[in-house]
From Swiss-Prot:
Keyword Ribonucleoprotein recorded: yes
Subunit-structure text: Component of the mitochondrial ribosome small subunit (28S) which comprises a 12S rRNA and about 30 distinct proteins.
Major place of residence: mitochondrion
Entry superkingdom: Eukaryota
GO molecular function: structural constituent of ribosome
One example of a Gene Ontology biological process annotation: mitochondrial translation
InterPro entries: Ribosomal_uS10_dom, Ribosomal_uS10_dom_sf, Ribosomal_uS10m
Protein name: Small ribosomal subunit protein uS10m
Cellular compartment(s): Mitochondrion
Record keywords: Mitochondrion, Ribonucleoprotein, Ribosomal protein
Length: 173
C-alpha cells in the first residue's frame, strides 16, 4: 500500500509541474526583416476547447473481492489527488456464479461427473464533473496499474451544447 501511495504522490507532483512549466506561445509576432515594422502575422490557430464529461462510470470484474476492494481504494485515491469529484462506489452483495458439469471420463460412466464453478465479483465506481484531458490522464493511469485477473469497463457521459434550433421556442402562428 505504501508503494502505491509513493507512486501516486510522484505522479501527482509530475502532473502539477507539467501544468505550470509548459512553454507560452506568442499570440502574434513582429516581422522586422522586410524593413516595415509592425506587420503582425496571426499565430497558430487556437486549440479546441476541452470536452466536458458529467459522469464516468467504471465497472470492475474479477474473481477475488479483496483485490477489487483494494483497487477501488487505489483508483479513488488517485482521483482525489487529481481533483476529481468522487461519486458512489458500490458492489452487489452476491457474485455471478457460472457452473459447468463435465463427465469424469469422456467415453463411459455417465454417472460420474465433475462440477466446476467460477464466481465473478463486480465493483462499480462513479466520478463526476471531469474535463477530457483529466479523464484521459486518469483512465490511462488506472489502466496501467490494473492488477491481473481484473477487467475494467469505462463508460463516459459527455456534456454537449443544446442545438440552436432547440434554444428558441417555436413562433406562434
Amino acid at each position: 500500500m505504501k508503494m502505491h501511495m509513493k507512486h501516486l504522490d510522484l505522479y501527482s507532483q509530475a502532473i502539477k509541474t507539467l501544468r505550470w512549466t509548459q512553454p507560452m506561445r506568442a499570440l502574434s509576432t513582429v516581422n522586422t526583416s522586410s524593413g516595415v515594422q509592425g506587420n503582425l502575422s496571426p499565430a497558430a490557430p487556437a486549440p479546441e476547447p476541452d470536452k466536458l464529461y458529467s459522469k464516468l462510470e467504471i465497472e470492475l470484474r474479477g474473481i477475488d473481492p479483496a483485490v477489487l476492494k483494494s483497487y477501488t481504494w487505489f483508483a479513488t485515491t488517485a482521483a482525489e489527488h487529481l481533483g476529481i469529484e468522487k461519486g458512489k462506489c458500490w458492489s452487489p452483495r452476491k457474485a455471478h456464479h457460472e457452473r459447468m458439469t463435465l463427465l469424469k471420463s469422456v467415453h463411459i460412466y455417465k454417472k460420474h461427473r465433475v462440477q466446476y464453478e467460477v464466481r465473478t465479483h463486480f465493483r462499480y465506481m462513479n466520478f463526476h464533473k471531469l474535463t477530457g484531458s483529466t479523464l484521459d490522464t486518469f483512465l490511462e493511469y488506472i489502466e496501467r496499474n490494473l492488477p491481473e485477473g481484473v477487467a475494467l469497463q469505462a463508460s463516459r457521459t459527455e456534456l454537449q451544447e443544446i442545438p440552436e434550433h432547440l434554444r428558441q421556442p417555436p413562433e406562434q402562428v
